Amino acid sequence: MKLAGIDEAGRGPVLGPMVIAAVVVDEGNVPKLEELGVKDSKKLTPKRRERLFDEIVQLLDDYVILELWPEEIDSREGTLNEFEVENFVKALNSLKVKPDVVYIDAADVKEARFGEEIKAKLDFEADIIAEHKADDKFVPVSAASILAKVARDRAIEKLKDQYGEIGSGYPSDPRTRTFLEEYYRKHGEFPPIVRRTWKTLKKIEEKLAKEMKKRRGQTSLEEFFGK
């Protein structure tokens, strides 16, 4: 029996991509994935996940990784959950090896609804099991989670090569906020790698507007930057 798992990494960050990974593994290889320590994906360090990536891929029948960048996220129609459903379906339908069962890490508060919305749009027949914290419960989802996290980590490292220290990309990361504030001060706008629909950016803009008004006596950011 072929089992699929699908998960995302980077849903919440203010910059960088959201990455979706879908994997297909033969039921007989699940114990081998467990032996690698895949089930404890959240306890793994980034370096350990990176080392596991190739070992996991060798045990898979197929896998697909989608990188969804800020421009695509910001231009979506509908909610973030609907966007996730759409791209979970895209990833699963892109698999060349079709699974008999699909395990899904549900983003919706109603697990069954999330699974039903995906099942309705698949181009193949499969049993769907959608649950919260599926990456802790089902090995195929744990494997997908690791692939997604590694792919996002790699994308962030490439961005660091281009922009310098940007932190993890999460709004709660002081390094990320510092990068965004300093970039805005220097350029008068945020870099193209940010999700412009995130409230974090609005808060930073408001903070800097007050700062600039106080320091320069300007009435607006537009005046300050000569726009």
Curated annotation (Swiss-Prot):
Binding site for a divalent metal cation: D7, E8, D105
Catalytic activity: Endonucleolytic cleavage to 5'-phosphomonoester
InterPro entries: RNase_H2_suA, RNase_HII/HIII, RNase_HII/HIII_dom, RNase_HII_arc, RNase_HII_hlx-loop-hlx_cap_dom, RNaseH-like_sf, RNaseH_sf
SUPFAM superfamilies hit by this protein: Ribonuclease H-like (SSF53098)
Any GO molecular function: manganese ion binding
Keywords, in A-Z order: Cytoplasm, Endonuclease, Hydrolase, Manganese, Metal-binding, Nuclease
Cofactor note: Manganese or magnesium. Binds 1 divalent metal ion per monomer in the absence of substrate. May bind a second metal ion after substrate binding.
Subcellular location: Cytoplasm
Gene Ontology BP annotations: DNA replication, removal of RNA primer; mismatch repair
UniProt EC number: 3.1.26.4
Domain RNase H type-2 stretches: 1-210
UniProt similarity note: Belongs to the RNase HII family.
Function: Endonuclease that specifically degrades the RNA of RNA-DNA hybrids.
Protein name (Swiss-Prot/TrEMBL): Ribonuclease HII
Gene name of the encoded protein: rnhB
